């Protein structure tokens, strides 16, 4: 190396700079791992660049080098390495070419097998636990093959269904692999599976897949079937451009090579069952011959068609018992299986060089062929022995040295002996008797995975070699008699076995034989454990975890998965190793987040925060784009110092320590003290000289720290004295010169200490200049930002100006400095400054610098003595410098980093930039932060500075630990299959008569009908057993029921009602079966014609699809509780002979297999325990139905008549049965001459019922099979549900107010009335009467700052004719929130009480009253958020005289109220919740069939539920509006639709399938023109008139009252207030049958944070009252949160506040039950809230007064403060989940992750501890433990009784309206109390 290039890092930076200068890209666009070609380097550029590099490095660099090392990182590493000699290079190449037997390292593995196996570790656990993944074929897997003629159906029915199946084979993460949904649909799922597992294997290997681009990496993939391609091309109309590549076998390997851009061999291998082991053999060969440098070997197998099953069945190869019993005497064939496995291979020398984990070593392998054996598929023992000998010869190993062989071991009676004899002959003979060859087969666990079988055995064997244990061979009980194990010196491993101790590395072989004769054997050996070299194993003090993903959601998912893993399986993996793997062994992705942590606990907490998208210490969430190029280092002046700064950096950051050490001699010389010692000892800098010198030293060292991580400045800016450090970094001064300037300046200033000062003001420059105009000695010293300035001058004048600014409610504060720089006070120092620095000889800066010293920013300063004299005197034009940098003519800079020990300027920087360039993207960062971990803070900011790719960190050579692989985000991809061609209908599905499904379009907008057609053949029945009535084969009623229930389930229903059996289905001749679902009706009919439809149809059963499928589970539970247990006096009887009982009644045989385990009879009740077959297909209810139907007919054993089902009132399905034992409970409710009626419940033991039948009616037959029909008994409504509803449906009842008792803590005596400020145009009339009562009233707004009481008299008239109710509400709301803000900012020792007066809102008859109504909701929230300043709200009659109200107001001011108060005729009323009583005034809602119904917000989650509810009540036409339009119906099938849009479309389709016409309209309900256009369009089209309204539109925007803005308020009020007013005008009273307003309990309960939302909902309540009085059926429903969806974002806040009062949220089912209940009553406003239990006699409960944990009045002030601090620390630490001792009492809560929910929880605990109610904003106003304790001490500390303590007492009695309402709940009727 020559010149200044001294290593790889320098070369990397040089190359980046070269590309930026010559190619035209920006630094942020240069990815060092991207190929030079992708960065724009052409061949011509390469020639020029090679010349530049040759000159720079002093040796020849060829352009060809750029292609051999195609990235910046690769090229820098190559050029930095010593130049190899030509001779040695040739020798290496010659040696490598001759190394054809080099060992191959296995460096990574991945797998996916049935049984939940998704990684090698899971496979190992699965094997060791002796588990099996074999089951029957999934129900839907063969559905496309169930068509065809009866003979095909018969063949399918006789085909073995045992197998080992992967779930969700249609799931694939297409987005991750950049594959369109259309292409993914046509891709063979084997291709998809291989992509995912290969990626996982590379991550397991620690090889970032992205680094393999254009590398000589080979792919060798074993696969042997392409069933998906055949299925996809069966219908030519479905073939498209993706079909060929989607179905071709070769693409299985090629697809992976294409995606990863691999340039080595890419081969799909098909040798049938040996494919994947042959793939491993070929991969090893390719590595040894240098065809590739890394190889991916794989095998994949999926079973999509029954064809191969049937073929193997025909030759007897498949096990009829469903088990692979390898080497066992009972072996009867194999079981087919699915799965995929991938291994990553390297030459062993390469793996050792690269520091890879070597899982095992492949020593040798061989492949051969059986040739002409005893048949194409018959094994050849001689060939098997030959391949074994060849493999061990290739491995250079004696056969007797192998310890274990993973055998092919399929479990065939003759195949196993042939393989065993070959193994024994070659590998077993000659072994000691006590050291036999151990053998086993993974097929006994996973089945025969065919093309993946070899790799499954290989991965198992590698794991065994690693762990030193051999998992057992399953199902081995008796040795196969044809295998002489003793003679062959072999033993089957039948238990978990320790690897034999042999004195040599563990060695094993793996065999795999293809059924066409291709044999393979691979020899592996234990890998050598790599131990870190001395010193390498030291963990860094701080670790950075880089969590990457293609999207932010993927980053979140990965972070959550890592946190779970680190707490669980990865608990023993060192944090540094986890970080190392994430940072260096995972591919870079477009999005990444980072977590910096010192220990595992911090790391897990950070990962959880990252997963949730929350801010937390050390966490940087993914950047939403890059801010652009250009980095500015900003050097602040004085003020960032703190004791302990830099100490951790000295210990943990070598670059920082080196910079301090390099600076130390110069620093000691210039400063006179040691910077190193000050930092290392955590000493505090004292005095001007020490502070300023220490800070510049710190800044210079921090600059080197940033640069060491590759972050270098393109421009520097200095703030005041910070310009010295900026000049040094820019190269204008040396460090010694910079220290000299600082020392001189500090020394000259020191004598002026105490004679001046500075203050930071929240004022812009013009305002500041006007402020100081009368103070000539005060100057504007610093232009900080558009909103901040700093003044300098004499101390007394500075303090006076601070007071003036604060009086204007603006921020002003002294700056911690004892002199006044940038002020005329410096004039006297300038001559000395010029004199002492006269010999200073600055240089031209090498880095751009903008000086803040001169008014003209374009001045090119010379940093000499004159400059520094001017610098200390002139104002600092920091704002102007930052604005110039952010928008300069030479190009804007976008990243600003403040180089300081604590950020002083970051906010000023961002304010300035956003003001100068609105909408532009900038980043403003600090470096360190006071009193935090230096290293964690710096690394966090370092990570924030990197938005395109994470910062480079050291890459130690030690192996990485395996951590969880990328979590996939699967979506469904499958072809649209058509059933095989043939005659009409298909074969019925198993257990049902359902066949091919067709959707039939209907006229107009009605939902489609559904048709299922099947052909029933006598020899291919869909059930296994027989079922004969008097010698005639009849389809059992259970199969018929199973058929229509299955159809209902496919349509989204889980219940049927009004089931009627009409005629039996004779199964002794072919029949065509049709099931038709049209709207709610479903029926089953058949025709005797076998080939085509006939007109001779017989209807067999009819039913109605249940209208409330969601209620099925609850009805099942209810029914089970009533009937699920036998009576107390029941006795267990002997089990009768079931077959005999059935035979007595003429029934022969059962269609399904089930047996009776116990029989318990008592009177009309019978409970029978039944056992189901273990292999019951998942989701099958056929056997359960069969048992229920047959046993119900036997409920009276003594009655021997034949009973046949006639009808069922309702049948409901619940949970799937999970065990073999179930209980059938029968309750006979009627028994007469005509028949019996039975209620039936079926449930597994201790589980939720899975099946319920209510009123199953049987008809008694004397002879024959003529099934009649019986009418079910009249149904009864769910009375119990309505009883529950009365517990949480309330109205507001107004009762006379009671005066608080002066003896309890809520009372107060006001003895010193204070000033009253009356705000409002109508307030003058109150003044005189209040003055007479001892108050000092004034109609004013300026007097608010001094008033004890503030009375806001609500305006009653709009500001103009065009002001709408929304405009009015926004205007008044803005006034009041500003008023609250002013009062909240007053000092705690000057409290005030806010009162609001409204008129006529209680009745809401007059328009002016309706306009004011929103204030009721706003008042409740103010009371909840600021109980300390709340007085109350009083509503006067519309015509009340304010002057006459004065005395009453004077009395009320002394009695603050939580509640809204209404004053009528001199009586003050307060609200209370009252249960709805009396007889209903109307019947339950029923919609007109000829009308339409409008739901605003109808496309939201809540609106769609309401649409379903109206449909249940007979609505046939629904108009659903939402602001976001749905796509055209032609696009509803697109896969690109997002999840939410898909949910809406599916809900609409479900409604249409029920016969409901749905019109989805994009309309803004608050916009009068939109609604008018909708109605006009309907009128033009002659649409049905709208006869009902549900106004459900609304949004939330939670903000504290003091933070509310006019725009935010309008956003919330627009749909609620504006929308309801538009609807009110469009549908006046009398024009509709009902007018429902969906409001929120927030409107009356005062939920903190929901001021605008509560206000809007109060308006809805008032509108409902107004319309009611005009005779319209209008109701405002004040909901609490709906569980699961509720009031959107506010649901949890509402639930938290309700929980505080002992209430809760409600389920949708409860909500609709309550709605139906209250709709029958004449109620305008219904409050739906679960009522808390009433308080006990002792006064405890929801309405108990707060009792403090301490008696504060008897404690000293210091004791109060100490107790409060300790108690608060305990409460806050518990909620924040940090150790109490680690909670810094001076640290802001926001830095600890405080959110609004936590704040509310802390507030509740603090209220109980302190004994008074507290403000919702308390924690934000007092953001540390110390400041909060200080605030509360003022509230509770003892002092003299005065005005102050009276107001303090006032705050203790105030609170939320929610508290008040619960305090005043009226007594419920006795039955309600009992239910409570």
UniProtKB/Swiss-Prot annotation:
Residues annotated with O-(pantetheine 4'-phosphoryl)serine modification: 43, 1796
This protein's UniProt keywords: Acetylation, Fatty acid metabolism, Lipid metabolism, Multifunctional enzyme, NADP, Oxidoreductase, Phosphopantetheine, Phosphoprotein, Repeat, Transferase
Residue span(s) of domain Ketosynthase family 3 (KS3): 101-526
One family name in Pfam for this protein: PP-binding
Region (Acyltransferase), start-end ranges: 626-950
Annotated positions binding NADP(+): 1491-1551
Region span, C-terminal hotdog fold: 1130-1267
Domain of life: Bacteria
Annotated region described as Beta-ketoacyl reductase, given as residue ranges: 1491-1728
EC number: 2.3.1.292
Miscellaneous comment as given in the Swiss-Prot or TrEMBL entry: Was identified as a high-confidence drug target.
Cofactor: NADP(+); pantetheine 4'-phosphate
Alphabetical list of InterPro entries matching this protein: Ac_transferase_dom_sf, ACP-like_sf, Acyl_transferase_dom, Acyl_Trfase/lysoPLipase, Ketoacyl_synth_AS, Ketoacyl_synth_C, Ketoacyl_synth_N, Malonyl_transacylase_ACP-bd
GO biological process, one term: DIM/DIP cell wall layer assembly
Segments of this protein annotated with the region N-terminal hotdog fold: 997-1112
Cofactor binding description: Binds 2 phosphopantetheines covalently.
Involved pathway(s): Lipid metabolism; fatty acid biosynthesis
Record-annotated Carrier domain positions: 9-83, 1759-1836
GO molecular function terms listed in the Swiss-Prot or TrEMBL record: 3-oxoacyl-[acyl-carrier-protein] reductase (NADPH) activity; 3-oxoacyl-[acyl-carrier-protein] synthase activity; acyl carrier activity; fatty acid synthase activity; phosphopantetheine binding
Gene Ontology CC: cytoplasm; peptidoglycan-based cell wall; polyketide synthase complex
Catalytic activity: icosanoyl-[(phenol)carboxyphthiodiolenone synthase] + 2 (S)-methylmalonyl-CoA + 3 malonyl-CoA + 5 NADPH + 10 H(+) = C32-carboxyphthiodiolenone-[(phenol)carboxyphthiodiolenone synthase] + 5 CO2 + 5 NADP(+) + 5 CoA + 2 H2O; docosanoyl-[(phenol)carboxyphthiodiolenone synthase] + 2 (S)-methylmalonyl-CoA + 3 malonyl-CoA + 5 NADPH + 10 H(+) = C34-carboxyphthiodiolenone-[(phenol)carboxyphthiodiolenone synthase] + 5 CO2 + 5 NADP(+) + 5 CoA + 2 H2O; 17-(4-hydroxyphenyl)heptadecanoyl-[(phenol)carboxyphthiodiolenone synthase] + 2 (S)-methylmalonyl-CoA + 3 malonyl-CoA + 5 NADPH + 10 H(+) = C35-(phenol)carboxyphthiodiolenone-[(phenol)carboxyphthiodiolenone synthase] + 5 CO2 + 5 NADP(+) + 5 CoA + 2 H2O; 19-(4-hydroxyphenyl)nonadecanoyl-[(phenol)carboxyphthiodiolenone synthase] + 2 (S)-methylmalonyl-CoA + 3 malonyl-CoA + 5 NADPH + 10 H(+) = C37-(phenol)carboxyphthiodiolenone-[(phenol)carboxyphthiodiolenone synthase] + 5 CO2 + 5 NADP(+) + 5 CoA + 2 H2O
Protein's name according to its UniProt entry: Phenolphthiocerol/phthiocerol polyketide synthase subunit A
Domain PKS/mFAS DH: 997-1267
Function of the molecule: Part of the PpsABCDE complex involved in the biosynthesis of the lipid core common to phthiocerols and phenolphthiocerols by successive additions of malonyl-CoA or methylmalonyl-CoA extender units. PpsA can accept as substrate the activated forms of either icosanoyl (C20), docosanoyl (C22) or lignoceroyl (C24) groups from FadD26, or a (4-hydroxyphenyl)-C17 or (4-hydroxyphenyl)-C19 fatty acyl from FadD29. PpsA initiates the biosynthesis and extends its substrate using a malonyl-CoA extender unit. The PpsB and PpsC proteins add the second and third malonyl-CoA extender units.
Region (Disordered): 1102-1130
Biased composition annotated in UniProt, kind: Low complexity: 1106-1115
